[in-house]
From Swiss-Prot:
<comment type="function">
    <text>Binds to DNA and alters its conformation. May be involved in regulation of gene expression, nucleoid organization and DNA protection.</text>
</comment>
<comment type="similarity">
    <text>Belongs to the YbaB/EbfC family.</text>
</comment>
<comment type="subunit">
    <text>Homodimer.</text>
</comment>
<dbReference type="GO" id="GO:0003677">
    <property type="term" value="F:DNA binding"/>
</dbReference>
<protein>
    <recommendedName>
        <fullName>Nucleoid-associated protein AZOSEA06390</fullName>
    </recommendedName>
</protein>
<dbReference type="InterPro" id="IPR036894">
    <property type="entry name" value="YbaB-like_sf"/>
</dbReference>
<keyword id="KW-0963">Cytoplasm</keyword>
<dbReference type="GO" id="GO:0043590">
    <property type="term" value="C:bacterial nucleoid"/>
</dbReference>
<dbReference type="GO" id="GO:0005829">
    <property type="term" value="C:cytosol"/>
</dbReference>
<keyword id="KW-0238">DNA-binding</keyword>
<dbReference type="Pfam" id="PF02575">
    <property type="entry name" value="YbaB_DNA_bd"/>
</dbReference>
<dbReference type="InterPro" id="IPR004401">
    <property type="entry name" value="YbaB/EbfC"/>
</dbReference>
Length: 107
């Protein structure tokens, strides 16, 4: 009886691993947009943290220091949006796992 329980747990763990891989593959194609300066700088990023596109309004091209700040802020905004989107999409998957508060998936 003990062997059956362990085998069941192993099968469940394998299914969970396969589902996690599928979710990660799906998240790789999800894109979010971070912005700063009321949309003067935009960063399009996948949920795998790959930057796909950076859009910069012509009006900020002459001020290098401001542009650097706006670019950093837009990237940080995109990263926060990736984390939020990932947590939302993983919520259903992780609901039965009893993870400690603040633990983020995928690891």
């Amino acid at each position: 009886m003990m062997k059956g329980g362990i085998a069941g747990l192993m099968k469940q763990a394998q299914q969970m691993q396969e589902n996690m891989k599928k979710m990660q593959d799906q998240l790789a194609s999800v894109e979010v947009e971070g912005q700063s300066g009321a949309g003067m700088v935009k960063v399009l990023m996948t949920c795998k943290y790959d930057v796909r596109r950076v859009t910069i309004d012509d009006s900020v091209m002459d001020d290098k220091e401001m542009l650097e700040d706006l670019l950093a802020a837009a990237v940080n905004d995109a990263v926060r949006r990736v984390e939020t989107t990932t947590q939302e999409k993983m919520a259903g998957f992780t609901s039965g796992l009893n993870l400690p508060p603040g633990m983020k998936l995928p690891f």
